[in-house]
């Protein structure tokens, strides 16, 4: 409990909020996307609690994922906020939506110290020590080091679940690097839990694992995943935005490339700014999770399943999180 309180207090100060004794102006009803991975779940729930307890909002959380949530916000104006929008997957349509004033980038960097890419586990390094000095492109010449559970004659590369923007990027990089011809299969984990489960199972059995992941996350820290250098330069935004991040039928000639620099935004609808008002928008603009704080919270969440009590503690223990406002 003491560890949790320390983490929570760290998170509150990291978000740039302080306790006050006064009451905030009511802001109306807001809908926030609770996306299907741990950091997004945490951010959505903390935002809900702060906006309800500190600003008098009525907040509804709705399930979400990178692409479906953005598409819904862009086309229908709902949900009102995505706390953790990985912008690389929607760079061009997001830029257009902002210019046409349908969406607002309320916070350009709500999480610090983040990044996406391809990773390997310690078992791979232990079994093949030379891999420590190899790039992803060099490792792709050795599918036999990572035999697929479905077909041991091929290497298994763990991709992203359906609905995540990285699913399209990994599928197109699979084609760009001619991985099928090299003897690889692109595996679908099915869900966030499936992706995490593949890492955990590989660790438990001390088997090599290679695939997509991102940071900050509890999994990177807990399982000591090592990010790979692609061994090729970033091939430019045109290749990335207009091919790599699109569906296969819209990306006929993907070029080999390193992963683009990761960018995460908190985006809100025009209705959010109108309904929530200046103070609520100001909170979203200023709240930031430093990477170490986020990782600490995520590790605690991962180690303590059945998290409903966690949110209740945040909501009702006002020694930790009473009425809040954004610092001037």
Give the ranges of each region predicted by the language model.
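Ligand-binding pocket segment of bilobal, Venus flytrap-like solute-binding proteins
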Residues: 71-72, 79-87, 158-239
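A conserved helix-loop-strand patch within extracytoplasmic ligand-binding domains
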Residues: 103-159
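Short, well-ordered beta-strand elements
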Residues: 27-39, 57-62, 154-158, 284
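Short, polar/charged alpha-helical segment
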Residues: 39-57
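C-terminal functional modules
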Residues: 272-273, 281-328
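A bilobed periplasmic-binding-protein/Venus flytrap-type ligand-binding module shared by bacterial periplasmic
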Residues: 115-128, 262-276, 299-300
